[in-house]
Structure formats: C-alpha cells, structure tokens
C-alpha cells in the first residue's frame, strides 16, 4: 500500500509524522502545485493532505485511490460527494485542536474587547506617555463579564468555549439550526441568538448549508 503526503510543509517540522500502519511505500512532498496533484497521486492508495484541493475532476483520474486523510478538521477542500460516489473514504483528525482553538478564540476576543492593538501602539509610539494623565480613554474597552455569547455550532469546540465563557461570567446561548425548533431548553432559536448576542462564535464546518450563514441580511 502506498501513501502520499502532498503538503508536509503545512505542519511544523517539530511535529513527527509517523508512517501509517500497513503502508509499505511512503512519500512526503513539502508542497504540491495544482498541476502536480494527479501525477503524484496516480499510484497512491492513500492521499494525505491539509490544504490541497481535491475536486471531482482530479478524483476521477485516480482509480487506485481508496482513502483521503486530512491532517486537519475542516474538509471543505475535498469534494466529498464525488469521493463517496467513487468509493473513496474521506477522514479527518477530529478533536485534536479543541483546547488550542478555544484558547485562540479568547485571546482574539480579549484583544478585540480591550482594543489591545490600539493601546499597544499608543504605548509604543509614546502617545500614552505624552498624555499627562497616565491614562487613555479612547477607544473604549469592554469587559466579558455580563456579555452574551451566541454559539453557532455546539460540538466539542463550541462546548469548550461555553465552559470558559461561563467562567468569565458571560451568558451563553446555544443556537439551534436555522429554521428549526429548539430541540431542548439548552438551545435557543437561531434568529433570537443573533438578536440577543453581543458576541457570536461560529464553530460549524464550512458546507453549502453554512456558507454565508451570517451575512449582511
């Protein structure tokens, strides 16, 4: 069995990528251009990718391919319907980034609520030192405590974000799927979540149904 990794450079060199069990031939390319994909995957039973796009036109040229394994959670770069029709399994790495994404979310949220970028610049360029009051009042800053956080997509990451948000003293609303009646008292109507939330966290996979889920309207 042969496995080909098309974009090894999307993972840090500090991360060891072990050869999967049962794989006799293993090839890892640092990066792969669109016009190199078919040639490199032609003899492969397994394709390992992170960001490389595999659409129907490509998959139809790979009769030996049995499995596409992503080194990430999102699978929107793979034509899953075409893969299914051709008998190719598609797998991802579920749950590996729950804590990391949760921490990153709150890092970005705190930075935005506290206008960290602006105030850091004000200290760096001397604005704060020259003010004379030893304080700045613009732009305004906001606390997380007491704010309402709407979560769209209540999987592992959504639930982890909920837990941390509650520790900050935030009110958390779980959004039911758009157009559906809330399945339990834990969930809130989708439109009500949008209307009542100070902050919204999108944690759902990118699919045709979720694309532009939150739009100008």
Predicted regions span which residues?
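Rossmann-like adenosine-cofactor binding region
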Residues: 54-59, 171, 177-217
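N-terminal Rossmann-fold NAD(P) dinucleotide-binding loop
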Residues: 158-159
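Phosphate-binding beta-alpha-beta segment of Rossmann-like dinucleotide-binding domains, i.e.
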Residues: 86, 94-148
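N-terminal glycine-/charge-rich "phosphate-binding" loop or analogous flexible N-terminal tail
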Residues: 1-44, 169-173
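A short, aliphatic-rich alpha-helical micro-motif
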Residues: 40-41, 59-62, 144, 193-195
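Glycine-rich Rossmann-fold phosphate-binding loop(s) that bind the pyrophosphate
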Residues: 154-155
């Amino acid at each position: 069995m042969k496995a080909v990794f098309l974009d090894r450079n999307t993972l840090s060199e500090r991360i060891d990528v072990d050869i999967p069990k049962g794989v006799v031939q293993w090839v890892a390319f640092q990066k792969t251009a669109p016009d190199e994909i078919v040639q490199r995957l032609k003899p492969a039973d397994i394709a390992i990718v992170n960001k490389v796009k595999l659409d129907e036109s490509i998959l139809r040229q790979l009769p030996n391919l049995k499995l596409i394994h992503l080194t990430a959670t999102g699978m929107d770069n793979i034509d899953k319907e075409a893969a299914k029709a051709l008998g190719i399994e598609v797998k991802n790495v579920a749950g590996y980034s729950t804590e990391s994404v949760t921490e990153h979310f709150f890092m970005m949220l705190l930075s935005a609520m506290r206008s960290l970028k602006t105030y850091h610049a004000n200290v760096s360029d001397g604005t704060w030192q020259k003010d004379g009051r030893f304080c700045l009042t613009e732009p305004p800053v906001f606390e997380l405590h007491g704010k309402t956080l709407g979560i769209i997509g209540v999987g592992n990451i959504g639930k982890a974000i909920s837990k941390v948000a509650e520790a900050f003293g935030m009110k958390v609303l779980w959004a039911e799927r758009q157009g559906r009646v809330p399945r339990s008292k834990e969930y809130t109507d989708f439109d009500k979540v949008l209307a009542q939330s100070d902050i919204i966290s999108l944690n759902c996979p990118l699919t045709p149904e979720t694309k532009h889920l939150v739009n100008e309207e």
